[in-house]
Amino acid sequence: MEYDNEENTWRRPSAQKVDRSKCNQIPKRSSTVAVVVLGLAVMSCLLGYCVLSETLPYESRTLRLVIIFFRHGARTPNTSYKTDPFKAYQWPEGLGGLTNTGKLQLYELGKKYRSYYANFIDEEYYEKDVQVGSSDKSRCLMSAATFLAGLYPPAERQIWNPELLWQPIPIHSLPRHLDNIVASTKPCKVWKAMYEELLEKSNKDAKYTKLFEYLSNHTGQDMHSVLEVDFLYSTFLSQQEAGLKIPEWTKNYFPNQMRSAFMHSLALLSHNHTLQRFKVGPLLSEMRENLEKSVSYSGEGPAPRSLLVYSGHDVNVVALWRALNYTEALEPEYGASLVFELHEELDQGFFVKVFYRNNTKIEVPMELKLSFCEEPCRYADFLQYIDTLIPEDWDAECQNTPH
C-alpha cells in the first residue's frame, strides 16, 4: 500500500536549518557595492529558505510525546507444507528468523524517524526519555535493536569502541504466556471462544471453497481454514523474498486470491469491539498512562518520557488499526508503523495526531483521519474513545482462572 503526497498526506521538512545570522555579514566597501552585496545576500538567504523550507526538520514546537509501534523486519518462513520443494532448505536464521534484509529495513526505519523527528528526539540517548517494549519473539527483539541503532547512533561521548559506532539500548519484553501488551499472546478464554466462533463461520464462506480445495490438492494436506491460508501465504512470501522459485501451481491463486483470505484472517483476531478490548486494551492502557503523564506535567520534577517504541507483529499492527475504527483490510508490510503524536497548542490545548507507514521505504507517512473526533482530535475526545477499549480488569473479563 503506497501513499502519494495528496490532501490526505502530510509533508514534513527534513534538512538542516539555514543560519540566517551569517547572511548579514556584508563586506565594508563602497555604499553602492554594499547595497549590491546586501541585495545578493538577502536574495541568497531568501532563495535558500525557499528551497530548504520544504525539507527542514520536523517542527517540534507543539510536540510532547511520540509513540511508535512497528512490525518486525523481513523473516524466514515460519512453517512449511507437505509438498514444499524447500522443506529441507537450511535457513541460516532458522524458521521465523530475522534476515539481513529485515535487519537493514528496521535500521533504515530508525534512521528515517531520527531525521523525521530531528528537532524533537535528543541527539543523545537517555534512558529517562525513552521506553522500548517488544514481543518476546527473537525477530521482534532484533528488529527493535536494529531500529534503535538507526534512531540513536552514539554521540561522541557515547562511543565505547571507535570501531563500532553502536550503543546498547535496553529493550523490555514479557514471556509470551504473560504478554497482553505488545504481542498480545497471553491466553484469554473469552477472546478465544469468540474468535474460534468467528473463524468457523468464515471457513464456511462459499467464496473460499474453491481456494481451499485447490490448495488442499496441491499442498498434500487439508486446507480448510483462512488461518491455514494465512500461514501458507506468509510462507510463499518469505520464500519468494529469499529468491526461491515457488511452484508453478501457486500462480493460479497466489498472491491475489490468497491475499484476500490472509487479510481476513489477520482482521478476525480483532474483528469487533469486544475482541479489540482483549487484543489492544492493555496496550492502549499503557499508552494512556504515558499520555496522561505528559499532559499533567507541570514542569517541576523529572520530565515524563517523550518517546515510546514497540516492536511487534503484523497482527498487532492490524489490531491497533482496527481499534482506531478502521474497517478497511490491511496488509502491513515488514516495518509497517503506526505513530501517535501528542501535541499542545496554547489556543487549542492538547490534541492527538496519528500517522501510518505501510513499509520502510515510504518517506512521508500518511496522516490518518480519526472518525471518532473532529480535526484536530482533542486529547479529551481521544481519551474518551480509547477508554471504551480499555478493560478495568483484563483477566477478569477474559474469565481466566487465577493461579
Where are these regions (language model features)?
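Signature for phosphate-centric chemistry
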Residues: E2-Q131, S135-H403
